[in-house]
Amino acid sequence: MYKRATLAAAILIFCGFILSLGAASVAKIRGYDLSNAWAFAWQVVAPKVVFTQVTSNVIASQVYWMGDIQDQELNESSGLASSNLSDDVLWSFNDSGDSARIFALSTAGVALGQWQINIPDPTDWEAMDSFTIDDQAYLLIADVGDNLQWRPFVSVVIVAEPEVDSDTGKILEPIWQKKFRYPNGPRDCEAVAVDTNRGEILFLSKRNLPNELYKIPLEKIKTVDDTMLIAEKVTDIHSIPRLSRGEEDRFGNATPYMGMPTGMSIRANYLLVTTLQDAYLLNRNDLSQPASTIRLPYIGQREAITFTRHADNSAYVSRERANSDEVADIFRVDFLLP
């Protein structure tokens, strides 16, 4: 947190100087939104706790520790997806700073291999999902992280899901890849899901309150031209609370971030969203309904969630390592559907 605050202070000074020049033309440099960067830096340097009063049903659940992520090169499991080709296999990748590679691991954390995708190194991979179309299994990886909320565009790439037993080490070629932006300015996002029933990709903003849900039709992603897409806003999500009063003492400096969505998965009529604090189950057919809360243990930087391959009431969650020698866990949570 100290390093983040120091960086934010430097950004604050730089962006404040540029914006103080008062010219609209310098509000952006190479397409990056300095106004949003300044606002983010100010939030980090002087964070404010946001309290929301949201009525949420707590549903019965049981959490099981599955194992440790054994591959030490997977130190920031920022996205998670259940395989559609193999039982008990998960896919993941590192947060920003790594090459364009994905990792396969068992649901107990055993390393099963790495695959490089033939694209330039990503800016900030933050989310992934697995899905099938016409019996072909795919993986979507979303380069949508934007802490400063200033990127001129973000992107997704889709590859055919490799066979863990036979394709180990194979270079994966992108099937589709697309750049896009949001209609109302840059958004930070770590929660993405593919809704094959409706034929769309969903993106849930992280920092906005209320959180905002956007979509892009899959058919537009599958076009081969270089057209920049514009995501369409679906709705505001009011049912994910940031905090309850009295929790500042429990979480300390992490308090302002505890209720921000860091992962999302979809199954049938449910959207499953995790935050650093708890998970929330939303009715995909009526997003105005209150979310159901699934209590999760506080395990540090929980970054990803995915439904298990065969169950609508079970999911895996993973967390990042804070340090290279720290254990990164995988948990399974089973819950009663409302």
Please identify what each model-predicted range represents.
Residues S20-P338:
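Sequence/structural signature of beta-propeller domains
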Residues Y2, F14-F17, Y32:
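Aromatic (phenylalanine/tyrosine) cluster motif
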